[in-house]
Amino acid sequence: MKIVIAGAGEMGSHLAKMLSGNGHDITVIDSDPKLLADVASLADVLTVEGDSTTFAVLRKASVRKCDLFIAVNHVENDNVVAAVLAKQLGAKKSIARIDNNEYLEPNNKEIFINMAIDYLFYPEKVAAQEVINLLGHTSTTEYVDFSSGRLSLVVFRLDPTSSLIGRELSGFKDDAAQLSYRTVAIARGGQTIIARQDEIFMEGDMVYVIARQDAVKEVMEFSGHSNVEINNMMILGGSRIGIRIATELQDEVNIKLIDYNAEKAYRLAELLDKTLIINEDGRHIEAMLEEGLANMDAFIAVTGRSETNILAAMLAKRMGVKKVIAEIENLDYINLAESIGIDTIINKKLVTASNIFRFTMSTDVQAIKCLTGSEAEVLEFIVKPNAPATKAPIKELKLPQDTIIGGVVRGDKVFIAVGNMELSAYDRVVVFAMPASISKIGYFFN
């Protein structure tokens, strides 16, 4: 697939690296030659220097021949203009990053569809929603619903108190004849291990389980964690993510939002009438303690600065806060943050990748989730009539290495996949796979 990316900043360079690694032909546009040099050193891409909102530059990047145009410039208006022009010049699909939730309202969204933009995505909104979902499942590190919640990926770290430590994976399964959950992978020491039945659970393992909705509670009992009711919450950072979280939850939870910028704090106080806004520097330990950090049920660090978020999250964990979530945009810091006990990490690059990746698939992909604690991805496919996957039991399909089918939704029935199961047309199938296998999976469901 030929893909043109407008914007060589952090998000654009991450997408270029990820997509070129999956065998796509990538061209990156940016007006900053240094950013272009940086992205060219990270990935096998072509670069075009110039303004992506001009016809000349878009023509130079051959957008008329591209299958997908992705606008991720820093300026929202530039993304909208570039996406419209690219589609008019011949791009098959055109998508744009936005920073304004107003654009996603149904009436306004229709306008952009009429302008020929295929998809608008707002990473901060998706990241905020992930945080809100996790606050309802505080014992998990990541929690992803598929097929309207009928199947879920449940991720948890094994604490010393977990009864799973020292047991084989084969021993962690539902005893019923029809399984209701199964382990699909373990992340350990920065590596992801696709589930093998003789693998031994170890303390600190990140465990990935596909579960039916009615089995999630049972799965979590094995983790050594328990869900905590969130009544008091502190948000560090009046960023777009922080504002959206407070807006959604301020009627249900007592929220303190801390921001070091006095002018912004005044604006936030007008915007969030049921949230207590505090003008303070979250890096000052004494100030955080005075504001009652130790009494919080949840702490969310979303300042936009990874280092500040990590330090503040470490303090919150030390003070005994039950659920600690930190936004970490530097991908190199993620393993470090997990190793020091931060419960959950959110990353806008991975959120964006999850939104965009499905546009590069030839198969009917309903959802993709790029995981934070693992290089693996989880995908939901719809099986087409006469697809190869319908011709033999799962164990005989010769799926790509490091790929495992976790669950299947068939009409109103939900199954955990086993080797002798045969897939049918229109099944919704949840697949856990490593990046090198992603491009090969679609064949089985087409």
Each language-model region and where it sits:
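Cytosolic regulatory regions of ion transport systems
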Residues: 1-446
